[in-house]
Curated annotation (Swiss-Prot):
It comes from the Bacteria. It holds the Pfam family tRNA-synt_1. It comes from Legionella pneumophila (strain Lens). The gene is leuS. Transmembrane segments: none annotated. Gene3D superfamilies: 3.10.20.590, HUPs, Isoleucyl-tRNA Synthetase, Domain 1. This is Leucine--tRNA ligase.
Length: 823
């Protein structure tokens, strides 16, 4: 055993052992409690950054700890390998996306191996492999057969730079989430999956996710956006269809002074066909900002269509406007405007000098309608037969009236819209559909799956190369035998990441999407990833899990039992980025200090949910601690090996109850730390685990070894310390455990047990405050009376109370604190 800690040698030795023994390859075991730990799989960008190191170390620490508890632990890894960056790199560097992706995977896999993460590599998944996406295509066809998939023309979010459709969630502040381009509105034929059919369950089952952050659940509730309201029908003059609007405030219906429709509403297009100014307005709104957060602050613009609607109760005509603040994807794309009782409608009415009619009277307060709208409930006025009703009652009465007169109905509305999964890009899973002039849309037969993405395509930087690949596009219809064409859109990459966790459970299954192993391993017991995925990946994965459940592929309702959302890694107060020049290279860190130091620092520097501020001195401090542990173990190696031999031969036994006082006290501290660290591991509070390990090490390194019992105490304590540290710094703990003569490998060692008798103590440490300020400390018997404790406190704080009158002595037992109040 070398005297000096050499992390490179230590880590190579540990990793070779794990590889040789296949330590992390697992199979199903019904005799053990299973634990499935998964970090969101990475996109193969080519290099790991410190955010990756933190995220995947968190998952690894949890997996190793659960294994030490005796559970059957699965921790797989794979690659979310489709997506725009590979295609963009192909255009820029003239290299095929597949080649670029494979090269990056190889580089990142090497980095993961150096970190020492306990992955079952035989389950590795790469989503661009046909063997993976074959089953995605198969499942999509099953959904199509069940009526959960459809294709229709839809106004979509179009990214003019990436030349593709974006989901609502992929539009950030009106711009494409990858390109940053201003998003346009465009009508295009799209494939959709009916996520709205599961809206109620997606909402209600959030309540079962007790181990998810409240913030994430609330974000999903807001995104699903369930509201109970009323659908109201307005007849339109010289227009064949009624205009449907949705409102949660039918009590304000009598105050409607105009209607407004979205720029892409059919009625707006009808008006534009006969009105040049309306068409010009629609054209000016093509780049409209669509992020809801911006609707409140953006300039509200509109134009009168010249068309009018009939109020369903009064029969009066109301002008219909096109407005940029009405969104087609929410509600019906039309709203009734009540300027007196909706601030947005009020601002629009002020700008265009539209009438403001008060129909709700505030209760107990005055309101100036010239200054703003009154948006709360109250008593109805100016509402004909509904006058004097409270808003809460009027909502029900007016809705009933509308239903009786076929002018509306009570309804439930959702903000959530069906998931558009088409992307006009090359590097993605081909959508397994055929378009035949005779037969319409025909699914690819199962025996012809997978539809393999061709690699002989040209990249021009715009549109989809698949449309130019005749060998791919032209095909015979499997139904009628006539010439047909393949669908050239590919899946949104969120489709691949919506079910990968289940495929990990049965990697290698060639005859089915999933098998019974998926039912054994799912749901994932602990999922780790960023909160930025709250309303995209996490919602889609929950949806897919329910789809797979209903297909009989899994037997649980939710995919992820517990969710940990880690914070970012910052340097100088900012997120690490090349543009700011504050990036820390994990390779350099590992080459200089070793993977264990990197792991120890990222676990110690901050609680997992909070942002981590990078500190070079913190890294050096973590490294110094590991060197001290190594040096201490080396110093006492012979003694510890002898004690191990005694224990293994059955001769090593200590009656701790008969041990001397100082040993009992130190052993009490060690087991107190063990109990707290175990509790902290259970709560994923790894920073306090490390803090406890440092305290434990200080306790034993300062301990004077004088008797045989002392040797057994040091042996027991170093055994506890190494097992506490092993999930966080697995390499050094593996080597020290072996070199100190402990039985088996530490990866197979059970979690240390707290000796409850050691937690009991004959003595208690007290602190003494004088007028609230810490002045002294002393040790007293647990049997000491209050009088004895106060006397001891006075004695130890003598210099601070002499010549003063002690007015009161306050004992706080649970804090072992005595406060002397002097005059």
């Amino acid at each position: 055993m070398d005297n000096t800690y050499n992390p490179q040698e230590v880590e190579e030795q540990a990793q070779q052992y794990w590889h040789k023994k296949q330590s992390f390859n697992v199979t199903e075991d019904l005799n053990k409690e299973k634990f499935y730990c998964l970090s969101m799989f990475p996109y193969p960008s080519g290099t790991l950054h410190m955010g990756h190191v933190r995220n995947y170390t968190l998952g690894d620490v949890i997996a190793r700890y659960q294994r030490a508890l005796g559970k059957n632990v699965l921790q797989p890894i794979g690659w979310d390998s489709f997506g725009l960056p590979a295609e963009n790199a192909a255009i820029k560097n003239k290299i095929p996306p597949a080649e670029w992706t494979r090269k990056n995977i190889a580089a990142m896999k090497e980095q993961f191996l150096r970190l020492g993460n306990a992955y079952d590599w035989k389950r590795e998944i790469t989503t661009c492999d046909p063997e993976y996406y074959r089953w995605e295509q198969w499942f999509f066809i099953r959904l199509f057969e069940k009526g959960l998939v459809y294709k229709k023309n839809a106004v979509v979010n179009w990214d003019p730079v990436d030349q593709t459709v974006l989901a609502n969630e992929q539009v950030v502040d009106g711009r494409g989430w990858r390109s940053g381009a201003l998003v346009e509105r465009k009508e295009i034929s799209q494939w959709f999956i009916k996520i709205t059919s599961y809206a109620d369950e997606l909402l209600s089952s959030l309540d079962s996710l007790d181990e998810w952050p409240a913030q994430v659940k609330q974000m999903q509730r807001n995104w699903i956006g369930k509201s109970i309201g009323t659908e109201i029908y307005f007849n339109v003059n010289n227009y064949p269809k009624r205009l449907k609007i949705y409102t949660t405030r039918p009590d304000t219906l009598m105050g409607a002074t105009y209607l407004a429709v979205a720029t892409d509403h059919p009625l707006a297009k009808e008006a534009a066909s006969n009105n040049k100014k309306v068409q010009e307005f629609l054209d000016s709104c093509q780049g409209i900002k669509i992020a809801e957060a911006e609707l409140a602050t953006m300039e509200k613009r509109g134009i009168d269509t010249g068309m009018t609607a009939i109020h369903p109760i009064t029969g009066k005509e109301l002008p219909i406007w096109v407005a940029n603040f009405v969104l087609m994807q929410y509600g019906s794309g039309a709203v009734m405007a009540v300027p007196a009782h909706d601030q947005r409608d009020w601002e629009f009415a002020q700008k265009y000098q539209l009438p403001v009619k008060q129909v709700i009277k505030p209760i107990g307060i005055e309101h100036d309608f010239n200054q703003s709208a009154y948006t709360e409930e109250g008593i109805l006025i100016n509402s004909n037969q509904f006058d004097n009703l409270l808003s809460s009652k009027a909502i029900q009465v007016i809705t009933n009236f509308l239903e009786e007169n076929d002018a509306g109905k009570a309804t439930i509305n959702y903000r959530l819209r069906d998931w558009g999964v088409s992307r006009q890009r090359y590097w993605g899973t081909p959508i397994p559909m055929i378009i035949c002039e005779q037969c319409g849309i025909v699914p690819v037969p199962d025996e012809e799956l997978p539809v393999v993405l061709p690699e002989n395509v040209d990249f021009t930087g715009t549109g989809s190369p698949l449309t130019q690949c005749k060998e791919f596009v032209n095909i015979t219809c499997p139904k009628c035998g006539q010439d047909a064409t393949r669908e050239t859109d590919t899946f949104d990459t969120f489709v691949e990441s919506s079910w990968y966790y289940a495929r990990f459970a049965c990697k290698g299954q060639e005859n089915a999407m999933l098998d019974d192993r998926a039912k054994y391993w799912t749901p994932v017991d602990q999922y780790i990833g960023g909160i930025e995925h709250a309303v995209m990946h996490l919602l889609y994965a929950r949806f897919f899990h329910k789809l797979m459940r209903d297909e009989g592929l899994v037997n649980s309702d939710e995919p992820f039992k517990a969710l940990l959302t880690q914070g970012m890694v910052l340097k100088d107060g900012h997120k690490m980025s090349k543009s700011l020049g504050n990036v820390v290279d994990p390779n350099h860190l590992i080459n200089t200090y070793g993977a264990d130091t990197a792991r120890l620092f990222v676990m110690f520097a901050s609680p997992p949910e909070q942002s981590l501020e990078w500190s070079d001195s913190g890294v050096e401090g973590a490294h110094r601690f590991l060197k001290r542990v190594w040096a201490f173990s080396h110093q006492h190696r012979d003694m510890l090996i002898d004690i191990n031999d005694s224990i293994l031969s059955g001769n090593g036994h200590v009656d701790w109850k008969e041990a001397e006082s100082r040993l009992k006290k130190s052993r009490h501290i060690v087991h107190q730390i063990l109990a707290q660290a175990t509790h902290d591991y259970d709560r994923n509070q790894f920073n306090t685990v490390v803090s406890g390990c440092m305290k434990l090490f200080n306790e034993i390194s300062d301990y004077s070894i004088e008797t045989e019992n002392d040797k057994f105490f040091i042996h027991s304590s170093i055994s506890i310390l190494l097992r506490l540290l092993a999930p966080i710094t697995p390499h050094i703990c593996h080597c020290l455990w072996q070199q100190l003569g402990f039985d088996k490998a530490i990866i197979d060692a059970p979690w240390p047990k707290v000796d409850k008798s050691a937690l009991k103590t004959d003595e208690v440490d007290y602190v003494v405050q004088v007028n609230g300020k810490l002045r002294a400390q002393f040790t007293a018997s647990t049997d000491a009376t209050e009088e004895e404790l106060i006397a001891a406190a006075k004695e130890h704080a003598h210099n601070f109370v002499v010549n003063h009158t002690i007015k009161k002595a306050i004992i706080v037992p649970h804090r072992q604190l005595i406060n002397l109040v002097i005059g």
